[in-house]
Each structure stands twice: as structure tokens, then as C-alpha cells.
């Protein structure tokens, strides 16, 4: 398949630069194939969830992963922590006029000292000094890493708004943005209706913003992210399916975790590890029946994923509708509900 199959023109003013004034007040485009497109608000989501359906949320928490400082040699440096390996070691993307060499000392804001001890591909391995853990150092001295299409610095409001209300486990560089729309009150309404909630963890990496640089998407190398699907979630999904109910993925990261856990056998299994699953049109879905997701970038792997799930013809019509009606796009933008189309293709 050619990358041009996943391109579209997006007016720049539709890229949301800030969250909505009130969490949960975003618009919701319901784009199920068995009904006309419906323009709703996100608080209407329970209207489309049946008692007994299971909604699976990604409980990852965004780290304040960006650090600014300088090398011992004096040059300025910026580090974006991609993955914490242990209490004092992390892998990071580095921006600097010259790449640091093994053994070079680095000093970041707050007096944080680190040594570059090696490389893993394009990532630099940093060993942090002192008694605090990497997570503690980041929480006290780091900066929230907003996506590259948000053209402003992070502020205090982002510390809460670029985080889901159910975030638990630090490790993400980017938020699972479909979850940003959910409030405690909406979660209560879903449970009152009889919906079941379950959780997975997938620590979203900076690779989620990585552009596809090849013409043939089959040649694209997908980034890897750590995930976990607990046995309780497997049981909740299996019970819902046995009742004839649907499994909802809240966000593409929840979908990638669930489908990764079922990739080997076709059946959902508990476990943890790294996944580089690349879902494109023609993929056979094993777990997810419904997807809540934001609107994605042109030519992105996430646009390919939703095209695989609902069919690219349907997705093109949905995106045309969204642009005509000026929905807000990307991380702080509006959301949509999609259903699985087994015949999904281009």
C-alpha cells in the first residue's frame, strides 16, 4: 500500500493547541457503519454503550520527561526520556550540537547530574547520580513533553489536562489522548448503566509521533513500546464476549495492547513485554469491537490503524465530515466512535 492512500489536507486552524475549557466537553462524532454519522458531545458516549459491554482503558501516566541542561564541555543539551530502565538508568533522545560520548557528564536543571554510559540504536543510555529515582527527578525538575504539533510551551494547566483522571503508572512520553475526555462523573455514569471497566498499561513512546518515511507502508519499521494486559482484564473481556457484549478500546494504545496480547494465538492472553505491532488495512482483529479515538495525523500509523479497523473508505468519509464541521484534531481535539468492519480495506 502506498503512503499517499493515507493522506488528507487538514486546515491548520483545526489543530487544537489547548484542551477544551472543561474536561469532557469535547465533541463526539459517532461513526458506526450501521447508522448515519451523528454529531454529539462526549458526554453522550453512554448512549452507545450497552449494559455488559467492557471498556478497556490505558492507565499509563505521562512523565515530565523533558530535561534541559548542558554537557560538562559546556554545550547545551536537551534530553527526552523514552524509557526508564531502573531507578537510576534511562534511555533518552538527545538534542545537542554534538552527540555526547560515553563517559561524558551532563548537568540538568535542578543540579541533576548524569553520565552517558552507552547507546541503544538512536537512544542514549543515561546513568543518573544521587539518591533519588529517575521518576522522582523528573517529577521535580522535568517538563511535560507536549506533542510537536502543539506550538507552545507546556504550562501548569497541561500538568493535569495532558493526563487522564485514571492515570496510575508512570512511563509514557505522550498521553493516551482518547482517555483525556473522560471525567470521574462520566465513568460513574457508564458503571451505573452496567458497563464494565478494565485496564491495560502501554507506555506511549515518542515514536507515536514518528513520521512514516517510506512510500510503501510495508517497509515501515514500527517503534516498540512496553505493555501489560493483566489477567483481570482478560477475564472481563472474555466474560463480556460470552454474554454477547462488545469489547471497547478507549484509544489506539489500548487497542494495540489488547491486539498485541492476542497476536500469537488469536486469543487474548495476560502478559507483558514489548510490542511493535503495526496494524494496517487487511489486519484481522481478534479482540476489539468498538474504538473511542481522537482524529489522527495524515500519513500516520494511527490513521492506518483506524483504516484497518473501520475501512479506509469509511474513514475518509468520516474525516471529510469532521473537517467540514470543524472538529478539533489531534491530542487536545475531539473524539469519534468507530466500529469494526471485517471487510475493512482501502
From Swiss-Prot:
Its main location: cytoplasm. GO terms for cellular component: cytoplasm. It is found in: Cytoplasm. It catalyses: 7-aminomethyl-7-carbaguanosine(34) in tRNA + S-adenosyl-L-methionine = epoxyqueuosine(34) in tRNA + adenine + L-methionine + 2 H(+). Pathway: tRNA modification; tRNA-queuosine biosynthesis. Transmembrane segments: none annotated. Its EC number is 2.4.99.17. SUPFAM superfamilies: QueA-like. GO terms for biological process: queuosine biosynthetic process; tRNA wobble guanine modification. It is an enzyme of class 2 (transferase). The keyword Hydrolase does not apply. One of its GO terms (molecular function) is S-adenosylmethionine:tRNA ribosyltransferase-isomerase activity. Transfers and isomerizes the ribose moiety from AdoMet to the 7-aminomethyl group of 7-deazaguanine (preQ1-tRNA) to give epoxyqueuosine (oQ-tRNA). Belongs to the QueA family. NCBIfam families: PRK00147.1, queA. This is S-adenosylmethionine:tRNA ribosyltransferase-isomerase. It comes from Neisseria gonorrhoeae (strain ATCC 700825 / FA 1090). The lineage of its organism: Bacteria, Pseudomonadati, Pseudomonadota, Betaproteobacteria, Neisseriales.
